[in-house]
């Protein structure tokens, strides 16, 4: 990456464009994400209905900034912006964020979603995108699936969908679906690199984790992952200790909230899509 000289005006980014397989080398040069290799990137770039990669170029034509997002239920989940050194301070991150919002609206998404750490810089961007806090403060845990277990294999799992788990008790879920507030036991899922990401914790207690993993395992196995990401209330210290004992990995040091911006009624000609996969466990 090239350093900018002091007192030199910021480099102006080119127009926002949708990225394709031809941008693979440029993306991997800028984006540093665990488990995002050329194979995972190729899979996402080949599924524009499920993953939205957008970027802007430097004046010489080289990729200068990238934003990654994905379909999660009927919302576009913003996963992160990566800006090369020459474009830092240019407003490229904000340019990409607003372009993603406009594209999502035009393509029939019901809104935007993003995990927001309240006291981090991204909270300001979330405010500019009018993302409103949804649900409790949570910690996101990356939980390994047990190596064994009588797991059925989901027949045609794709990149996202809906998982319905029969409630173990009549008690409410530990974290209700943060995207829709659907009936207990129903959550949205999306395939994010090496893990399956759930939009809630559909069981009543963290001690019911085994049932949740058993329900998610067929999907995870079908898409080639061995880990599941789950939100757990940040105030539930016993849940955090329980998950730590299972070698679950907490994805951020401080709690996060799901920020959500709903577009309102779907635009004419862009009907909301049904989830590609609905699996009942």
Provide a role label for each language-model segment:
Residues 13-27, 154-172:
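A short beta-loop-alpha structural element at the N-terminal edge
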Residues 14, 60-66, 76, 182-186, ...:
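Glycine-rich phosphate/pyrophosphate-binding loop shared by adenosine-nucleotide-utilizing enzymes
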Residues 104-117, 222-232:
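Conserved GNAT acetyl-CoA-binding A-motif
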């Amino acid at each position: 990456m090239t350093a900018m000289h002091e007192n030199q005006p910021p480099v102006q980014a080119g127009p926002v464009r949708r990225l394709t397989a031809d941008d693979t080398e440029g993306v991997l040069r800028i984006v540093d994400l665990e488990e995002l290799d050329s194979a995972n990137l190729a899979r996402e770039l080949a599924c524009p209905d499920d993953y939205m990669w957008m970027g802007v170029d430097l004046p010489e034509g080289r990729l200068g900034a990238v934003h990654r997002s994905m379909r999660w239920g009927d919302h576009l989940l913003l996963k992160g912006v990566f800006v090369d050194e020459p474009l830092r301070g240019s407003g490229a991150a904000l340019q990409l964020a607003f372009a993603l919002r406009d594209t999502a609206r035009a393509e029939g998404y019901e809104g935007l979603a993003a995990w927001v750490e309240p006291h981090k810089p991204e909270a300001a961007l979330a405010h500019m995108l009018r993302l409103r806090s949804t649900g409790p403060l949570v910690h996101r845990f990356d939980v390994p699936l047990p190596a064994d277990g009588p797991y059925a294999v989901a027949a045609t799992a794709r990149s996202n969908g809906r998982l319905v788990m029969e409630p173990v008790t009549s008690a409410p879920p530990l974290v209700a679906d943060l995207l829709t507030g659907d009936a207990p036991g129903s959550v949205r899922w999306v395939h994010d690199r090496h893990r399956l990401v759930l939009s809630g914790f559909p069981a009543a207690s963290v001690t019911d984790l085994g049932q949740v993993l058993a329900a998610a395992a067929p999907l995870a196995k079908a898409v080639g992952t061995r880990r599941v990401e789950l939100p757990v209330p940040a105030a539930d210290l016993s849940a955090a200790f329980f998950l730590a004992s299972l070698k679950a990995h907490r994805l951020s040091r401080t709690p996060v909230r799901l920020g959500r911006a709903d577009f309102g009624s779907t635009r004419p000609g862009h009907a909301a899509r049904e989830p590609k996969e609905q699996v009942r466990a």
